[in-house]
Amino acid sequence: MSYNCCSRNFSSCSHGGYLHYPGSSCGSSYPSNLVYSTDLCSPSTCQLGSSLYRGCQETCWRPNSCQTLCVESSPCHTSCYYPRTHMLCNSCLTMHVGSRGFGSNSCCSLSCGSRSCSSLGCGSNGFRYLNYRIHTSPSQSYRSRFCHPIYFPPRRWFHSSCYQPFCRSGFY
């Protein structure tokens, strides 16, 4: 099964009121349960769990996974897919592979509330690290480690071993 992967420049793309992006429309072939971000990459068709080269590397990731795969290939910036659904995980893994010599780093992204990013339970600079146990409000019933599907601005990737997400109102 393949998906048509949107490139960057999509305008106000809002999938189910989930997140909003700059650029043009994503189109119906955009997987509703994946969030995709890239820079300077042309669209291509990706097989789940595999990648194709079209001037840069684009990657599709399984929608039922709590992992995030981020790949950088010159001259392009990073391409990432995130699971759209909130999922409980035993661990959160973020992989950074690219020409800048980065290996693998593990971290959990910040928990997003309805209006802002929460810094509770986070490490230095507001980042939450691998296997950090968190407790959210009873209404959300997330009491263990989990990954949130969050869009990261592409040019802020290689900032630290963990990355602060870009949260929008109405995340939940």
Swiss-Prot record:
Keyword Repeat recorded: yes
Family: Belongs to the PMG family.
Coiled-coil zones: none
Gene expressing this chain: KRTAP13-3
Name of the featured protein: Keratin-associated protein 13-3
Annotated source species: Homo sapiens
Domain of life: Eukaryota
Task performed by this protein: In the hair cortex, hair keratin intermediate filaments are embedded in an interfilamentous matrix, consisting of hair keratin-associated proteins (KRTAP), which are essential for the formation of a rigid and resistant hair shaft through their extensive disulfide bond cross-linking with abundant cysteine residues of hair keratins. The matrix proteins include the high-sulfur and high-glycine-tyrosine keratins.
5 X 10 AA approximate repeats as annotated region, ranges: 46-101
